[in-house]
Amino acid sequence: SQTAVYAGGLKIEGVKKQRVEIDALNKKLSPFVIFAGIESDILADGSLDYPDDILAGFDFIIASIHSRFNLSEKEMTDRVCRAMESRYMTILGDPTGRLLLAREAYPIDLDRVFEVAAANRVAIEINADPHRLDLDWRVLARARAAGVTISIGADAHNLAGLANVEFGIG
C-alpha cells in the first residue's frame, strides 16, 4: 500500500517496476506463474489507495484498514462495504483490525460485511498471524452461512512469517 510508508509500501512507480519484473519472470519460468498482488489501504471514504488503472494490473488485491480506527460502527461498516464494491478488491484483509492484547477490534457490523462480501465475491481473510488471529473463529460459521469465501493469510512480512499459516488452519 502506498500510504503504508511505515511498512515500505510501494509508490506507483515501484508498482510498475515490480510488474515488469513479474512479467519477465513469468515469461522465463513458464509454465510456472507468479501472480501479481498487493495489499491496498482502505481509505476513510472507502476508496482504495491506488488509482483504478494501477489496480487493474493486479491478479488479486487484498484491501485492509490501517488507519482511522476510531469511526463509529456505521461509518466503519460503510467504509468497508464501499471498498468491497470496488471491482478490483479480491480479499478483505484484517477484517476487524484487532491486535491481540494490544488493540481491540474496531466496531463493525460483520453480518452486513459478510452480506456485501458474498454479493461482490470478495473473500474475507483469516489473518493467521498469532498476534492477530483475525477473523475470530467464533464468527466463521456466520461468514460461511452468508456464502463468503474464506482466505487464509500468514501476514508474512518475511520468509519466516509464512509459518504463521499453520495458525489459520490448525
Where are these regions (language model features)?
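Charged catalytic cores and adjacent phosphate/nucleic-acid-binding surfaces used
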Residues: 2-33, 44-170
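Short loop/edge segments at beta-strand edges and connector loops
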Residues: 36-38
